[in-house]
């Protein structure tokens, strides 16, 4: 499941684990979330291209864009996240969850980390 995700722990509620899959051409990481773990709302920014793609590989999780209903992620589910979209993703309350995260190449790409997903918001899932 990778190593404890200490470098990004301040952007997560709960414990997550990170395993690098590739750093050539496209950055790909396997991210594993314990039950109820989720990352903060965030935005992948780029002046051209950019964004992220998630592929569920184990367990059950959630993806949500601001202002839209949450989408369940199961093994094989593919989520395309365009640059500039505020969103979060993480595990279901009753399941460990893992996804592959692909960083879509872009110009001047960066992440803007925002507020945590509150327990009140999360518990509505």
For each predicted feature, which ranges?
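Ligand-binding loop in jelly-roll beta-barrel domains
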Residues: 62, 74, 83-111
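A short, N-terminal "cap"/entry segment at the start of jelly-roll beta-barrel domains
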Residues: 1-29, 40, 110-125
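Short, charged/polar surface micro-motifs in flexible loops or helix N-caps
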Residues: 24-26, 34-38, 60, 107-108
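A short, compositionally biased micro-patch
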Residues: 24, 34-36, 56, 66, ...
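Catalytic core of non-heme Fe(II) oxygenases with the double-stranded beta-helix
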Residues: 16, 20, 34-55
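A short beta-strand-loop-beta hairpin characteristic of the jelly-roll/cupin
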Residues: 38, 48-75, 85
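Conserved hydrophobic/aromatic beta-strand scaffold that supports enzyme active sites
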Residues: 18-20, 28-32, 53, 70, ...
């Amino acid at each position: 499941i990778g190593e404890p995700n200490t470098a990004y722990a301040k952007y997560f509620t709960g414990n997550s684990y990170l395993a690098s899959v590739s750093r050539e051409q496209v950055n790909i990481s396997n991210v594993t979330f314990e039950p109820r773990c989720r990352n903060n709302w965030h935005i992948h920014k780029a002046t051209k291209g950019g964004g992220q793609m998630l592929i569920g590989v184990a367990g059950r999780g959630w993806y949500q864009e601001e202002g839209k209903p949450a989408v369940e992620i199961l093994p094989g589910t593919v989520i395309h996240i365009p640059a500039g979209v505020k969103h979060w993703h993480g595990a279901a309350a009753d399941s460990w969850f893992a996804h592959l995260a692909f960083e879509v190449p872009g110009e001047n790409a960066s992440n803007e980390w925002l507020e945590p997903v509150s327990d009140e918001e999360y518990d509505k899932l």
